[in-house]
A protein has these predicted regions:
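Glycine-rich beta-strand-centered segment in the early N-terminal region that forms part
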Residues: 29-44, 56-96
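Residue-level marker of beta-strand positions
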Residues: 87-88, 107, 175, 244
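N-terminal Rossmann-like NAD(P) cofactor-binding module of classical short-chain dehydrogenase/reductase
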Residues: 90, 221-224, 246
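Glycine-rich phosphate-binding loop and adjacent beta-alpha segment
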Residues: 99, 230-296, 330
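Glycine-rich NAD(P) Rossmann-fold beta1-alpha1 loop
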Residues: 134-135, 160-167, 228
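Adenosine-nucleotide cofactor-binding segment
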Residues: 174-230, 288
Length: 332
């Protein structure tokens, strides 16, 4: 196997401040320093990847750059003792694909501390069917359960339910016995959400409270919010006493206007979900759960596979909110 050059998407910034993307040949020697060189077999597409690929300086500071915040593959060289040549591994989070050359290339070089061994019972492709979006969904459920939320306490709402994070959250919660309500702007995808385990599907406009009231009727024991903005504001008002809300996204807005009343009168909690710097012990636990108790083969039906060359169109679709389920990139 030739480990000297590889194919990758490279995003360049032109003199006119435009960003252009091409699949090019790169040298392995151009990769950043790191303990472990990995041949990437699969990657996956996330909203943050599309931001990086279109020149968002809040995600990626300098160009040229290879995006891809997820990668799964085989170790081809390692300077550490715990990770060996031939090991199958997953890398998500940290700086991968942001300012470190990412998974939209056939090779990555990263610190050993970023690497999680592929859990038993999970294939490399399956790991990227989850990727950062699926891991974030699982981490949200993990934190919700850790806060004491149980199926017997009532309905759990998932916002952005047809997206990469939301669809996995619906699937996991349903498997754990929760009564899941999925909120989406794509009511034509109601059947998909029902198949994933949602007991009820509502239009996102139902989470658009304009009453000005600090609290509404308590409906949900828990909420997994993936979109932020006004929907999160409304969701906070509708959580029952002792409930919990997790939040991990901002596609519906980064501002949050609320009052203290849901917190001091209903004792609710708001938990931020960060999958980037998640502690390694929690990261291992969550990936192990995804490979075992939380696995749901139904997700396979809502995963599309594509090549590097086909990614350009996907960037546009995900930024427009028109991509459903998960997209896996086959790098082999």
């Amino acid at each position: 196997m030739n480990h000297t050059s590889f194919r990758a998407i490279v995003v360049n910034e032109t003199e006119s401040k435009q960003f252009v993307r091409n699949v090019v040949e790169r040298e392995v020697s151009s990769l950043p320093e790191g303990d472990v060189l990995i041949q990437v077999h699969y990657s996956s597409l996330n909203y943050k990847d599309a931001l990086s690929a279109t020149g968002n300086k809040g995600v990626t500071r300098t160009y040229p750059h290879t995006p891809g915040i997820d990668a799964a593959g085989e170790v081809v060289s390692s300077e550490g003792e715990t990770i060996k040549v031939g090991d199958q591994v997953i890398v998500t989070g940290y700086d991968l694909g942001m300012n470190t050359s990412g998974g939209f290339g056939e090779y990555i070089r990263v610190p050993a501390s970023w690497i999680i061994p592929l859990p038993e019972g999970m294939s490399l492709k399956e790991s990227m069917m989850y990727g950062t979006a699926g891991f974030t969904a699982a981490l949200s459920v993990y934190k919700l359960i850790g806060a004491g939320i149980a199926p017997s306490m009532g309905d759990v709402l998932v916002t952005g339910a047809t997206g990469g994070v939301g669809s996995v959250a619906v699937s996991i919660l349903s498997k754990l016995g929760f009564n899941v309500v999925g909120a989406t702007g794509k009511m034509e995808e109601e059947e998909m959400l029902i198949r994933l385990g949602a007991k009820q599907v509502i239009h996102r406009t139902e989470l658009n409270d304009e009453s000005g009231r600090p609290m509404l009727k308590g409906i949900y024991a828990g909420v997994i919010d993936t979109v932020g903005g006004h929907m999160l504001e409304t969701a906070l008002k509708t959580v029952k006493y002792g409930g919990c809300v997790t939040t991990c996204g901002n596609v519906a807005g980064q501002e949050l206007q609320t009052t203290v009343y849901p917190f001091i009168l209903r004792g609710i909690s708001l938990l931020g979900i960060d999958s980037v710097q998640c502690p390694v012990d929690v990261r291992r636990d969550v990936w192990t759960l995804l490979a075992s108790e939380w696995e749901n083969k139904e997700l396979l039906s809502y995963t599309e596979e594509c090549t590097l060359e086909e990614l350009d169109e996907k960037f546009t679709l995900i930024l427009q909110g028109k991509l459903k389920g998960r997209t896996v990139i086959n790098m082999k």
